[in-house]
Design a protein with these regions (language model features):
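A generic local secondary-structure boundary/capping motif
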Residues: 103-104, 121, 130-132, 149-152, ...
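Amphipathic, small/basic residue-rich leader segments at the start of a protein or domain
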Residues: 1-82, 89-113, 124, 142
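A short core secondary-structure module
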Residues: 141, 145-168
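Conserved residues at the C-terminal ends of beta-strands
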Residues: 48, 118, 163
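Short beta-strand-to-turn element immediately C-terminal to the catalytic PLP-Schiff-base lysine
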Residues: 93-95, 134, 162-165
Length: 168
């Protein structure tokens, strides 16, 4: 039931407040659209309710992606990269309770996350990456050394998932 309510709300918003042709022409998603999508929960579809997200299932996330894809590919890319390969999903799976409490509410409400994998000489092949994250002597940090070529959602992101090699 909650999934249906969200999908209907998203469908209505897309129809009445977005212009996919204009987004395609300009290559820009209006800031107001990003803000509105965050306020309606579209940035936190799978983020648990306890962290301010909608807490919906993968099925409902897929339904939203299909709806977005049938309306505007750019919005689909923004939301799917943010929630799947950006910060929220890795944080849900691998983050500490403290990290989840600090960051997930921000992403659920509209802060956008980015993803950085691609490198100049190796493309997007993680097995050949040259960027590294080596533990500090005390093991508390992993300083990153290297260079990434681009980042999905980077223009609008407040946090970025960086994919490096590590010795462990």
């Amino acid at each position: 039931a909650q999934g249906d309510i969200f999908i209907n709300k998203l469908k209505d918003y897309l129809k009445n407040h977005t212009d996919p042709d204009e987004i395609d022409r300009t290559g820009e998603i209006p800031d107001q659209v990003i803000k509105d999508l965050g306020e309606m929960g579209a940035m936190g579809i799978k983020i648990p309710k306890e962290y301010g997200g909608l807490g919906l299932s993968q099925t409902n996330y897929s339904r939203a992606a299909m709806l977005l894809g049938s309306h505007c590919g750019n919005l689909t890319a923004l939301l799917s990269a943010h929630q799947s390969i950006g910060v929220p999903q890795p944080l849900i799976v691998f983050g500490t309770d403290e990290q989840k409490q600090k960051y997930l509410p921000l992403f659920a409400k509209g802060n956008i996350s980015a993803f950085a994998l691609t490198e100049d000489k190796v493309g997007s092949d993680p097995a050949k990456m040259q960027t590294t994250a080596t533990p500090s002597e005390d093991g508390k940090t992993f300083p990153i050394t290297g260079k990434k070529r681009g980042r999905t959602n980077g223009r609008n992101a407040t946090r970025i998932v960086v994919i490096p090699q590590s010795p462990t």
